[in-house]
Amino acid sequence: MSVFSRLRNGIPPSRDDCQSPYERLSQRMLDISGDRGVLKDIIREGAGDPVTPDASVLVKYSGYLEHMDKPFDSNCFRKTPRLMKLGEDITLWGMELGLLSMRRGELARFLFKPTYAYGTLGCPPLIPPNATVLFEIELIDFLDSAESDKFCALSAEQQEQFPLQKVLKVAATEREFGNYLFRQNRFCDAKVRYKRALLLLHRRLAICEEQHLVEPAELLVLLNLSFVYLKLDRPAMALRYGEQALLIDKRNAKALFRCGQACLLLTEYEQARDFLVRAQKEQPCNHDINNELKKLSSHYRDYVDREREMCHRMFAPCGSGSSVGGN
């Protein structure tokens, strides 16, 4: 059903009603700008805290001109919308104000007057002058990066002055960013975030009384780094971080599995088998581990067959016409 069909269904116009669809809709909307330049109608309530200034948001949106059923702008066709930072990636003032009023999971409809949208000139040929536009926005999630960005900009000496809980919070935020970028297949960017988190945690490991509090967070980041290096086709680095994770928890099934995967890619079959069998011992019913062991068995059989064929050729008796220099 189109936007304007919904408007008509929501507010049936009377015979003498000469108002436009946007004017009718605006009568039931909440003024969030103070001058009725940005109006809001909540379609589905969200939960938790509202978006914070300087946050990075994950949203789906569609923008409509009045009397038009098809959006002039939308990111709903994307499988995974990109993360956008307030104040940098979002250019519409109205959208920024609207997002600051939203909570996770919320779906809302907004009307933006020209001052909060495309101005008096519009954006030819797509947006006419003095256009009021309607946006439907769904806030999927947001990450508050302001605190993390400010903290990471400090020197190591300055960071050491903060309590451990602050460091753990910033490291967790960096890891969350990395996880989001990983889900978008932006593996190099994810790696940078994970390494930032690891650096913050390593600086606190020097304080002995904090080690037992830092290591659980460090373990998660090391597992992330091992996985992202597998995705980047760098198994040696994946093995390195996986082994560091095992120094914290030698029975961690995920770390053992990552090390096994890395060794298989490095064609270190005996090592791969050792890691994977240990992982299977921890999680006997894990399908990924069991499938990787089957994959290892297949690769090893192929390897043995190739070695046998090579040896056969090396030591096969020479034929009568195979001498060097023969015609």
Curated annotation (Swiss-Prot):
Disordered as annotated region, ranges: 1-20
PROSITE patterns: FKBP_PPIASE, TPR_REGION
Domain of life assignment: Eukaryota
TPR repeat boundaries on the chain: 171-204, 219-252, 253-286
Keywords: Chromosome, Cytoplasm, Differentiation, Meiosis, Nucleus, Repeat, RNA-mediated gene silencing, Spermatogenesis, TPR repeat
Gene Ontology terms: cellular component: cytoplasm; cytosol; synaptonemal complex
Signal peptide (UniProt feature, chain positions): none
Subcellular locations according to the entry: Cytoplasm, Cytosol; Nucleus; Chromosome
GO BP: cell differentiation; meiotic cell cycle; piRNA processing; positive regulation of viral genome replication; protein folding; regulatory ncRNA-mediated gene silencing; spermatogenesis; transposable element silencing by piRNA-mediated DNA methylation
InterPro entries (alphabetical): FKBP6/shu, PPIase_dom_sf, PPIase_FKBP_dom, TPR-like_helical_dom_sf, TPR_rpt
All copies of domain PPIase FKBP-type, residue ranges: 54-143
GO molecular function, one term: Hsp90 protein binding
Family statement: Belongs to the FKBP6 family.
Associated disease: Defects in Fkbp6 are the cause of spontaneous male sterile mutant 'As'. Males are sterile and aspermic due to abnormal pairing and misalignments between homologous chromosomes, non-homologous partner switches, and autosynapsis of X chromosome cores in meiotic spermatocytes.
Subunit structure, interactors included: Interacts with HSP72/HSPA2 and CLTC. Interacts with GAPDH; leading to inhibit GAPDH catalytic activity. Interacts (via TPR repeats) with HSP90.
Function: Co-chaperone required during spermatogenesis to repress transposable elements and prevent their mobilization, which is essential for the germline integrity. Acts via the piRNA metabolic process, which mediates the repression of transposable elements during meiosis by forming complexes composed of piRNAs and Piwi proteins and govern the methylation and subsequent repression of transposons. Acts as a co-chaperone via its interaction with HSP90 and is required for the piRNA amplification process, the secondary piRNA biogenesis.
Protein name as annotated: Inactive peptidyl-prolyl cis-trans isomerase FKBP6
Organism: Rattus norvegicus (Rat)
Gene assigned in the entry: Fkbp6
